[in-house]
Amino acid sequence: MTSEIIVQTAEELIELGVTLGSLLRGGETIELIGDIGAGKTTLTKGLARGMGIAEEVQSPTFTLSRVYDAPNRRRLAHYDFYRLNNAGIMQAELAEVVQDARTVTVIEWAAVVGDVLPDDTLRIAIRVQADDTRRLELEAGGKCSKHIVQELMK
């Protein structure tokens, strides 16, 4: 199942993230696809806000990962593998994290760890358009991610 959403501004991208975050209960995996500057971390900032995380989300480009505590014993694990050619130990860590029912896992530049992502991964490709709007293509990999996409499209 693939759906498409157009956002006009960074604020709309954050608001979409807020809505997405409000739908997440833990155990979900989201792969963000897009060029540098497309808005992957911006979307994640909104997602964190929607999960009830007050802490400011920062890009994990140089740290590879950041974890944020959310209400109701949930967590947001945000990964950015842009700088990795080989996942190494991060692949083993990620394999554990995506199995945690309390953790929402968001991964940027996931190609290097793609074989550990669950089948039921929500893939969101963010494409910058000529007029600087963003076209988001949402692909649901399974039942849970399909439900999330259906709720987002309402």
Can you annotate each of these PLM segments?
Residues 3, 49, 87-90, 95-154:
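Short phosphate-coordinating micro-motif centered on Lys-Gly-acidic
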Residues 1-19:
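N-terminal pre-Walker A segment at the start of P-loop NTPase domains
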Residues 40:
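Conserved lysine of the Walker
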Residues 29-31:
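Short hydrophobic/aromatic beta-strand immediately N-terminal to the Walker A/P-loop
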Residues 21-27:
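Phosphate-binding P-loop
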Residues 33-35:
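P-loop (Walker A) phosphate-binding loop of NTP-binding proteins
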Residues 53-68:
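Short beta-strand-centered segment that lines the nucleotide-binding/catalytic pocket of NTP-utilizing
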